[in-house]
Amino acid sequence: MLKRCILAENRKLHASPIWAMFFVLPILSATYGTFNYLQNLEILTDGWYSLWTQHTLFYSMFFFPAMVATYAAYLWRLEHLGHNWNLIMASPVPPLDLFAAKFAVVTKLALLTHGFVFALFVFCGKVFAHLPGLPPVTLPLFLLRGLLGALAVIAAQLVLAMVIRSFAMPIFLGLLGGITGIFISSKGFGLLWPYSLMQLGMNSNKSADALAGSYGLFAFSCIFWLGTMFLLAWLLLKKRDVRA
């Protein structure tokens, strides 16, 4: 049943307007990051690492939470129309399978987005910043860590989009979560807030490894928040009545 749900969710993406955002927002983020890097070369002297911080800081703080929030709201949009929710709750599909299917599809989109962001990073580094060689091997590792941290954000946004019928409100809350995440991280409590995990994983605000000596805690926090969001979704869906 889960496989059928995933196929159904994938069909929603065919000719979807969210693909325009998929391309536009990473390009905007890369443009801003590259411009900021080129304007501060006297300060940002660590080559590929410095460019990485400029590319990923605003991406992880603003653009990615907004994109994931939009993906999640779009996938829940059909269920919130008319009486579709009641029909779905009365269907033989296990409610958590529906949530898990949406999670799988948004995770796929996030993986594609991360790949596109890294391709833009390399392109801008070579073409505009004229950096020598190729990016250090640690940067793809940061990207993978960021994807692990992003899973908690994806699950959180799916819960918000599930319980809030408004399309715009979950997106606003996603942006708010990303903004608060950077401040919480700056105070040293990033592992306690799901929206900080991707920023920490991607090492988006410093050249030195922000997770040095804390990989275990980072993995635990990612798993904890992911499990918490799935448990919350299960409890809400168990009531078979999610309202705005």
Residue ranges with predicted function:
Residues 1-7, 76-89, 147-170:
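Cytoplasmic juxtamembrane interface segments
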Residues 17-18, 82, 94-96, 100, ...:
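Membrane-helix interface segments
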Residues 21-26, 164-182:
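Pore- or pathway-lining transmembrane helices of multi-pass membrane proteins that form conduits
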Residues 35-52, 171-244:
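Terminal transmembrane helical anchor/hairpin motif
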Residues 75-107:
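Helix-loop-helix units of permease transmembrane domains in multi-pass membrane transporters
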